[in-house]
């Protein structure tokens, strides 16, 4: 057992390992989950489900960050952006990291125990996706697509929690999330591309090569098209489609940031995706208030 004094001194290191000082990953995981809850519940999801999924998102994203740093501990020291991570520098041991990831995953599973059994079953592939994603960068040409599945798995889980099933519309929304994730995480990968080329890991930014900017914009277009299809299928009104238009305008602005492939501006574009997710969520909420489902 870790003594209280020791735990308090190490807590800041654990929080850094969980990336709680950088909440963008939590937000990019949260927005699709909230979209799913609102769509599944026709605009009025139960409060307890919102709380459970919000907490679960924070916990599983944190666990995913710990697992990612464990998997990449031999690479991160060679990348400018990651060389000071606690596991890379040895400030946190491998044993501590694995125990932390296991603890976060366990608490997250306990949260969903009161929910529909299908949610518990879906949590198994969700955990596998979160744990295996870091390793896909070693053999998949576009690991960002795998990330999109992992980051979007709250979508089928949200529908299962509300409806007790996962309808086709949930999988369509998950597909949209995959394209969105490829878009924003390619922007992120453009930041690390010089380092990633040196150490030999695979990313969409490397795979797309000189077509990276075009690929990002195409993925945004497909994602918004699929989200619009979800809106049509669920009978959404002008507020929601107006939100899609605003999100598309943000993506067009991203083009001005990433076209020169400046690392700092690519990172800014990546961070702006929080606003893409937020705009779509707010538009969905307002649309359901203005045009309740029949």
Curated annotation (Swiss-Prot):
Q: Does the keyword Mitochondrion apply?
A: no
Annotated transmembrane regions: 24-44, 47-67, 99-119, 139-159, 164-184, 213-233, 238-258, 274-294
Metabolic or biological pathway, per its Swiss-Prot or TrEMBL entry: Cofactor biosynthesis; ubiquinone biosynthesis
How this chain sits in the membrane, per its record, is: Multi-pass membrane protein
Reaction it catalyzes: all-trans-octaprenyl diphosphate + 4-hydroxybenzoate = 4-hydroxy-3-(all-trans-octaprenyl)benzoate + diphosphate
Task: Check the UniProt entry and state the signal peptide residues, or none.
Answer: none
The alphabetical list of record keywords is: Cell inner membrane, Cell membrane, Magnesium, Membrane, Transferase, Transmembrane, Transmembrane helix, Ubiquinone biosynthesis
| UniProt superkingdom | Bacteria
Sorted alphabetically, the Gene Ontology cellular component annotations on this record are: plasma membrane
Location within or outside the cell = Cell inner membrane
GO BP of this protein: ubiquinone biosynthetic process
Q: Which cofactor does it need?
A: Mg(2+)
Concerning PANTHER family, the annotation shows: 4-HYDROXYBENZOATE POLYPRENYLTRANSFERASE, MITOCHONDRIAL, PRENYLTRANSFERASES
The text of the family note is:
Belongs to the UbiA prenyltransferase family.
**Descriptive protein name:** 4-hydroxybenzoate octaprenyltransferase
Q: Which organism is it from?
A: Aromatoleum aromaticum (strain DSM 19018 / LMG 30748 / EbN1)
> Organism classification, top ranks?
Bacteria, Pseudomonadati, Pseudomonadota, Betaproteobacteria, Rhodocyclales
């Amino acid at each position: 057992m870790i003594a209280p004094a020791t735990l308090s001194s190490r807590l800041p290191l654990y929080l850094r390992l969980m990336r709680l000082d950088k909440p963008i990953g939590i937000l990019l995981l949260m927005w699709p989950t909230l979209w799913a809850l609102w769509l599944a519940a026709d605009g009025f999801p139960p409060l307890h489900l919102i709380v459970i999924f919000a907490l679960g998102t924070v916990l599983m994203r944190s666990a995913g960050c710990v697992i990612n740093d464990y998997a990449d501990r031999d690479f991160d020291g060679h990348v400018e952006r990651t060389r000071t991570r606690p596991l890379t520098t040895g400030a946190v041991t491998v044993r501590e990291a694995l125990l932390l990831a296991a603890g976060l995953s366990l608490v997250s599973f306990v949260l969903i125990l009161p929910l529909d059994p299908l949610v518990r079953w879906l949590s198994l592939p969700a955990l596998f996706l979160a744990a295996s994603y870091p390793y896909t960068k070693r053999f998949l040409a576009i690991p960002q697509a795998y990330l999109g599945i992992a980051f979007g798995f709250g979508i089928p889980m949200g529908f299962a929690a509300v409806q007790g099933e996962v309808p086709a519309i949930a999988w369509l929304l998950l597909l949209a999330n995959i394209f969105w994730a490829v878009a924003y995480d390619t922007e992120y990968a453009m930041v690390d591309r010089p380092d990633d080329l040196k150490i030999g890991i695979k990313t969409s930014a490397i795979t797309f090569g000189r077509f990276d900017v075009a690929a990002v914009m195409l993925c945004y277009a497909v994602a918004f098209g699929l989200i619009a299809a979800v809106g049509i299928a669920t009978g959404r009104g002008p507020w929601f489609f107006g939100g899609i238009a605003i999100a598309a305008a943000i993506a067009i602005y991203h083009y001005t940031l990433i076209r020169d492939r400046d690392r700092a501006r690519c990172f800014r574009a990546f961070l702006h995706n929080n606003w893409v997710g937020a705009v779509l969520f707010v538009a969905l909420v307002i649309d359901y208030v203005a045009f309740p489902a029949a």
